């Protein structure tokens, strides 16, 4: 996950944030492994809202750079979709940043059946 969320430089703070804030909101992490080494992770939660209904939302999807292209991201996305079905969700969503460095990820998303259905707008509140 540190390859994706580079602003967390302190491992203990990252773990605290996941355990104390994310997990109580239903956040879970699953991984893909090469032997004993975790090479890809997906962080997800089930959300409920009036616009989408029950939705499995992927907050985080990250594969170590040296293991990209081996199918780990695809496998995790497919697992998450199936988990959403198991939990009775009717939608599967994720947001992705934009820019040339995201093209490989976007290709994966399109190739796994995801489509762009909305713009996600944001502004800092500082």
List PLM regions with ranges:
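Acetyl-CoA-dependent GNAT
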Residues: 1-53, 77-78, 124
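Non-catalytic, surface-exposed connector residues within folded enzymatic/regulatory domains
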Residues: 12, 52-55, 70, 88, ...
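A short, internal acetyl-CoA/4′-phosphopantetheine-binding micro-motif in the GNAT/acyltransferase core
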Residues: 48, 61-68
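Conserved acetyl-CoA pyrophosphate-binding loop and the N-cap/start of the following alpha-helix
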Residues: 67, 71-79
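Conserved active-site alpha-helix within GNAT-family acetyltransferase domains
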Residues: 74, 86, 90, 98-119, ...
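Hydrophobic pocket-lining residues that define ligand/cofactor binding sites across diverse proteins
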Residues: 80, 84
